[in-house]
Amino acid sequence: MLTGGSPTMHAALVNELTHFANERGILITIETEGSHFVTTDYPIGLISLSPKFSNSRPVVGTTTPGGKVVDERFVAQHEKFRLNYDAIEKTLTYHDDYHYKPVWDGTDEGLAEIESFRVKMDIPKDKTFVMPAGDTRETLIEMYPLVFELCAEHGYNMTGRDHIIAYDTRRQV
């Protein structure tokens, strides 16, 4: 599983990893927001697509987990690559398999974005795994029942964020 940041920004490295995995019969999963399409000599076994919806927009004046203060330029860069439909469509078509893992913040607007994207990209409900929004254990515990209910009502799957439940706000674990 390759995750964190945007692994598909590193096309040469990803392609090299597909060679390594193919020679050994290893399945590669890449978790990506979909901002960059990468061709590889061997298709990636599973794309875990977690697009950035409007609820992911950084807030000016806050500090990122990496310690940077968010400014207008940071927000503009985020928005520039937030939803690259062309790259996402190519990624889902080119590689072997995928699932869609949107983060839901509990709002009607958030649900509308999740469903609009799913329909636009023609993603089946059984490939949709909704994750609760939140970056603390306490927030996730509040969100889990809401996400379970949403998934039951709409025919989606639910996936947790176990690393946050286990480690709360600790980084690099």
Which residue ranges define each predicted feature?
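Glycine/small-residue-rich loop that forms an oxyanion/phosphate-binding "nest" at active or ligand-binding sites
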Residues: 1-2
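Short, charge-patterned binding micro-sites
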Residues: 5
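Conserved AdoMet/S-adenosylmethionine-binding subsite of the radical SAM
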Residues: 8-173
